[in-house]
UniProtKB/Swiss-Prot annotation:
Binding site for glutathione: 53-54, 66-67
Pfam assignment, any one: GST_C
InterPro entries on file: Glutathione-S-Trfase_C-like, Glutathione-S-Trfase_C_sf, Glutathione_S-Trfase, Glutathione_S-Trfase_N, GST_C, GST_C_Theta, GST_N_Theta, GST_Theta
Reactions mediated catalytically: RX + glutathione = an S-substituted glutathione + a halide anion + H(+)
Family: Belongs to the GST superfamily. Theta family.
CDD domains: GST_C_Theta, GST_N_Theta
Name of the protein in question: Glutathione S-transferase theta-3
Tissue: Expressed strongly in liver, and at lower levels in kidney and testis.
Organism of provenance: Mus musculus
Broad class of where this protein is predominantly found: cytoplasm
Self-association state and partner proteins as the record states: Homodimer.
A GO CC term attached to the entry: cytoplasm
Single GO term (MF): glutathione transferase activity
Amino acid sequence: MGLELYLDLMSQPCRAVYIFAKKNGIPFQLRTIELLKGQQYTDSFAQVNPLRKVPALKDGDFVLAESVAILLYLSRKYKAPDHWYPQDLQTRARVDEYLAWQHTALRSCCTRAMWQKMMFPVFLGQPVPPEMLASTLAELDGCLQVLEDKFLRNQAFLTGSHISVADLVAITELMHPVSAGCKIFESRPKLAAWRQRVEAEVGESLFQEAHEVVLKAKDMPPLMDPALKEKLKLSVQCLLH
């Protein structure tokens, strides 16, 4: 059995892995795990990833979890072009720096913005206090400012003049609040221009393909299965803080 990627394109790290593999011509078998249907809780998936999270990679008998680890594994194994994860010590350190920051900063507020603005009220039927959403959106705005001032600065991409895995991870995060109707690029021309450059490097068709599911999420019908609804609510209550 060749390379298998367990993904749900509703998930931002899954989209980053999907885009990277497709863009670099890496052959893989897509194994879709639909998070909103609770497929991550099945015993069969737990045998692949006991953490019950996606993305997950299976390469023969080798199994790997965590999106950053998967991206770097694919980059090394398939000898992706150097710009994705540069050999230059300091440029690579800049990529590592961004990946270390975003996991608890940008990812956290992007995920909470999307769920509080759209998924809780529309999909789970659970209203979110306006003051909570306002606080989350203010935090997101602060993270976007750090993204501009600390990482993008006056460069073409987050770590220099070429696209890297840092840009893939960042753009897929930002499309989460975009899918919920947050106009995060409208008042930030520098970030908007960066987004256009990332899309151009990835390819508009691939970018749209990877984000089709999440951009249609606002049209999903409410979840009706009461048992699954309660299970999902419990798993995402941390996003209401």
